[in-house]
Amino acid sequence: MKTYTYQNTLISKKQLKQLLSWSFTTYDSMQACSLADELKYLGFKYASKAGISISIEDLKVPYNKNLLLKIAHQEINSSEKIYLKGKLTDVERFQKLIDTWNLTSESLKDELVSYFKRYDPLNSVYIMAFSGARGNLSQVRQLVGMRGLMSDPSGELLKLPIKKNFREGLTITDYLMSGYGARKGIIDTALKTANSGYLTRRLIDVAQDIIIREKDCLTKHSCLIINFESNLRIKKSVYEKILGRLLNKSIYDEKTKELIAEVNTQVTPNLIRTLKQKQIKHFYVRSPLTCSLYRSICQKCYGWDLANENLIDIGERIGIIAGQSIGEPGTQLTMRTFHTGGIFTSEIRGTIRSPISGIVKFSKRLKRIPIRTNRGEDVLLTKNAGSLIIIPEEKNSKPVKLELFRNTVVFHKNNQYIQKNAIIAELVDDEKQTRTEIKPVLTTTSGEVFIPRIINKLDNINKTKLLWILSGNVYQAPQHSFLNFYNDYKINKNSYIFRTKLINDFSGFTVFTNSKYNLFQRILQLVSNSCWILPNSKIQKLQSSLNKKPYFLNIKKLKYLIDLKLLNSKYFIEISSNKHFGTLVTNNYQTLTGGIGYYDFRCRDRIISDNKTISYFLPWEPKKKSISLEFLTLLESQFLKSFDILSLILKKNPDLEDCRLAFFPNNFNLHSKVETFSHYSKQTNSLNLAWFSIVKQFPYRSVIWMSEENYELNCDKNLLLVEHGNFISKNFEIVPGIVSKTGGIVMISDKNKLTQEITIKTGSVYEGSLFNYFKNKIFYPGEIILDSLKITQPSFCECFEGRFNDQLLIRPLQVYEVPQFKSLIQIFGTKFQTDLPFNLTNNISYRCKSNKIIKESRNFTIIDNILDVNIRTFAKKQFEIELFSDVKKNHLNFLVSEKLSLNHFILPQLRYTDIQSCLLVQTHQFIDSYTILGYLEVMISKSLEIVQFKSKYKDSKQICLISNEDCRTIPKNSVKNKTIDNLLINNANVNYTGKILMDNDEFVTIQKGRPYFFPNCKNEEAIINTDLIYKPLQSSSFLDNSKLKTNRLVYLNYFDITKGLINQRIHSQDIICKFSKMFIKKNGKLYSSLLAGLINRIAIINKQLDSQQIPSCPTSIRKYREENSSKKLKKRMKRKYKKITGIKTLLFIKNSELNLNPLKDTQDRKNSLTVATFMLSKFYKFTGGIHSITEDYFDEEVNSVFCKNGEFVKNGQTIGLLNFEKEITGDIVQGLPRVEQLLEARKKKQITKNLPINKKKGLLTQTTSIDSYFEFKKLGTSIKENEKINPHNLLKVYFNYYGLIKTFFCENSYTKDSYRLFNNYEASYRSFKKVQSLILNSVQSVYKSQGVSIADKHLEVIIKQMTTKVLITHQGNTSLLPREVIDLYHIEYINKIARIHKKHPALYVPLLLGITKAALNNPSFISAASFQETTRVLTKAAIEGRVDWLRGLKENIIIGHLMPAGTGSPVYTNCFKKSFENNLN
């Protein structure tokens, strides 16, 4: 040791590290080794001599522990009382509890340390804690302080702390809590180690072929590293980042301009010292990310080998070293948290205390906004840096000035008195990792919601809401239920509160009842005592039935096939919506074969349906004889289309003489029902009611049928006896055993090899030429065609090309007339009862659709005559109709039975309440119609004295009973100045808190209540709680008549500007445009504009408008029209103003920043409004503006309240949601998955909150565009946990920014120009660089939070492998395929060749791959197959015919070659030189 000064300092672990590092750098490794050995022996020697042991006496508990615990208990009790008074939320109380215990634990620890330092510095416990070996202060705290708050397995905090320490001993409860909070030891370690090991494997696999192959890649790119210092605290030095790298640009002294270091100089500690002295802040260094080699890195870009602090050797396998360096700390960190056993620790915040007592004054520059902390304190947050002055009490003293940074929480207001050493302000910790969670607020009692009116203006501004729940019993009842009590009534146990009657429709007998307690299982079955008789009819069963309906019904001479169900030898009709009861057996509409039917489908659609009746108010005056109605107001146009001809039947009425409708003469039938509403017409005289019933009397209903025989045969083509295009006669054999029914042209089509489809188009064929005139025409009987051919029946002509001549096929048409169907009275001859709960109807059904081919060779029925059973009651499923024949009288009797399930009689929301049933009927009892069958009721479990009751109607009836149990009586003199309906908060006894119900001069009756507090609350009345509340203007005329005052109009225009800030002035109106930049950071959130459709803000200040009416001009929309000019290349636009009539103009009300009037008028600003107009342009697509690329869209979450004033709530009901920030305990258990997420480049699921009118959120676009507190943030900085940016999204955003074709506007000359910032390669390269820095910093921030330092170059090697691929979007003239993945350097090489040959290059977008995907996309298929998905990789490689060049380590080892690294690395330096012997020759 040449020059060594004597060190008289305490050498701890940190100093030992520095000592060894110094010796290693200054001397060689051998000397450093011997020094380490010497130190080791020295340590062991003195440890042996000291003989330090630990005994129970060394564990000294601080004497003031009990006092600290007592103070903590008092604080917690007081916060509990404040919570019950409704001044704190549940979340804030919990936070306060945590803070209190945390502070107690910390102060105990501080007491302990100060005691040891002062009185017992050689205490063995103290030595262990501060030795820097495996000991830790948190363990000492548990030994002699208090264990403190514990967390459960999911990381949630338990409210109860462990107050004891190990010296005092734990109770059983404490021990259980300790075990609950600690991680599950072995299992946890094993899992996490496996996880970490797998991460290491993937990292090595992705980078195993990265070797130092060359000395210099001659790259022009470099990384810029800036050493910047922020106002708040000086950031960690960046000099350690550049140690061991090579400079890519020379460094000059800024003042003297002399050269400090040249290009390619290695950055050594000496050079760093020089840079610090000269205060150089910018360095351009080389990095593995900037190296231009393919799948390898050059010596100069990598820099030092960190093992020996020399330039790395050629052939060094840096990929594997990088993988191990990143993966190994993961294994270390997983095992690190087990010493403390799940103890919660939170850092104490940095605070500013007042040095003197005095009055606080803020500077005018300091902008402050009121916020509420998570501990329930109303404080001020500074939006910019500024200062405050404390004016002292003593006259002679000087005022004290304190500087405050941005985002400082200030606890005192302006002009407020402050005492000495009181906390003035607290710094907001930016580095703290938090996540926002939502906690539902549940009621603890049932009762009525009461929201008192806000008297305090501050509460109104802060949007706080106080909600009382006044105690009471809440019941829900059906709407028409009868209540069984009054005020001051006493209800006994087991009596009912309300009742609802159950009444039947028709008379009959009860067949079945059950006495089940549950309402779901309670059933009552009734059978009607009267049957409906169908005369002259009987049911017969078919002997053998191919049909699904085996029974038929004989009525007179008609036979209907009917659908019956046989049950206990009784016939039942099964009721369902799509089934028909019976079908008439008739051959009238039967065709010989299949074919095509044509009819007017509009007729068919309306035959089945019932008569429609449309009610309409007819304003008419008695003097006028005619009424005219507009077409659209009367009927929907769709409804009218479905009718062909509507006939008019007019009922004569003295009030309505000659009512003709102006628009539909003879199309409507008009029933006047004025007499029913006579009281109505007498009052108004000018109004009358008329009903329009559309009567469907169709003069024609014909079906035209063109027959076509169709066979589908499973046979070989050789077996067919006919060929395609043959004309065959009737009864011709097609295949053996099958004969045609009609004659005509044969068409054969192959469905597949085995199935042949044969179609015979019926008709007669004529051969000849020039048949085009007859093609697709219809001829009628009596017409003559082809000179001599007379048509005998309606025919359709088709033309075909034959082998020799054209063929004309004349196909006969059959016309089926559909008659008016008879009513049932005409069929059955007698009237039937109308009082039954069902009726029979006679309908017609078409079995074929118009113009649709029916492929059939057998007979086919076109039209069915149908009997339908229609049910009138609502419970169709519970309905049965029984049929039985009376053979003597030849009658058929219909008997109705109804199964009543009581569950169907109440609303769905009441089904799960306590409603019970009580039936008054027995089995086999006769019941007349409209008899009370029973009741639905709710019984009471205990007797109550009712003080008051309230009921209200919604969907159901809600009842709130206030009984004597819900009230308290106190003497009147204890509550002075309070009247009825006043709220009372009792500080001493929380049970006597509530609302005053009665007052009898001596005593006061209080309804018990409990307040719930919701700060920063959203009102349901206001639609959106953002700066910009908007509502659409219905019409442009609204503004002209209104007297709302403003003097500022705001245009929110969509522009597409990519560079900086541009100020424009249009001289007529003084318009100033401010264009926002690419990335905007607002209150800790990053916003970006996708596709660069950025919003700008234009404030038009019209000085003449001082508190005048708004002119109607702002409701215009500017529209630009594009004009192509042939002379000039630039496209010019003309500006056009156009009035708007839709809802495109938005009206912004009460906006905080917009309406701050520059003229400062003193009028009430409640009426002020802002008109925003959007510019529409047709010739380019713009997006919806700025989207957030972070997890949260909005800076401050709003608490929600779900109940309104006067609403009745039940116990355990959710009445609102509270948002709160939760601190995440820094632990690699959260860290490892986060590293994995970043390196695997997982796509985060984006929660879509950017709906324009989303009630919970708000209008994002306008919120971000009109906000003065934008903060721009470089992407090179580390990002907090709650600002997780999706890297895929970021890559897309940047590529769009750099690579998309942009449109630029100039508003003065109205011109538009288009170009892009960079070409495709440059845009991809730059986008990749941005994402690389993001991933690098994100991974480093996770490791740094654990106190692990990894050299950047290791991560850079890995990240480079993730960001080399691109995805082809258009192949151009290259041989690539769309969506093919290829290396960026490769595609650039291909495109370069394409450009030389003047071909179209391929287009592509950058693609970010995770480490697994990157390893599988390795150019070596042997390496990829040995990693994962072996079969798939090898199959794909075999199909593609890929060649493996055996470049990496893995593939060479698998094949059995020498590893191409270290001594085995191939050197090609002499390959291209002539040999020495050749040179001699």
UniProtKB/Swiss-Prot annotation:
Binding site for Zn(2+): C217, C291, C298, C301
CDD domains: RNAP_beta'_C
InterPro entries: DNA-dir_RpoC2_beta_pp, DNA-dir_RpoC_beta_prime, RNA_pol_Rpb1_3_sf, RNA_pol_Rpb1_4, RNA_pol_Rpb1_5, Rpb1_funnel_sf
Pfam families: RNA_pol_Rpb1_4 (PF05000), RNA_pol_Rpb1_5 (PF04998)
Reported cofactor(s): Zn(2+)
Reaction catalysis annotation: RNA(n) + a ribonucleoside 5'-triphosphate = RNA(n+1) + diphosphate
Top-level taxon in the UniProt lineage: Eukaryota
Record-level GO cellular component terms: chloroplast; DNA-directed RNA polymerase complex; mitochondrion
GO annotation, biological process: DNA-templated transcription
Cofactor: binding details: Binds 1 Zn(2+) ion per subunit.
Keywords of the record: Chloroplast, DNA-directed RNA polymerase, Metal-binding, Nucleotidyltransferase, Plastid, Transcription, Transferase, Zinc
Localization per Swiss-Prot or TrEMBL: Plastid, Chloroplast
Major location category of this protein: plastid
EC annotation from Swiss-Prot or TrEMBL: 2.7.7.6
GO molecular function, one term: DNA-directed RNA polymerase activity
Family: Belongs to the RNA polymerase beta' chain family. RpoC2 subfamily.
Subunit-structure text: In plastids the minimal PEP RNA polymerase catalytic core is composed of four subunits: alpha, beta, beta', and beta''. When a (nuclear-encoded) sigma factor is associated with the core the holoenzyme is formed, which can initiate transcription.
Function: DNA-dependent RNA polymerase catalyzes the transcription of DNA into RNA using the four ribonucleoside triphosphates as substrates.
Protein name as catalogued: DNA-directed RNA polymerase subunit beta''
Species classification: Eukaryota, Sar, Stramenopiles, Ochrophyta, Bacillariophyta
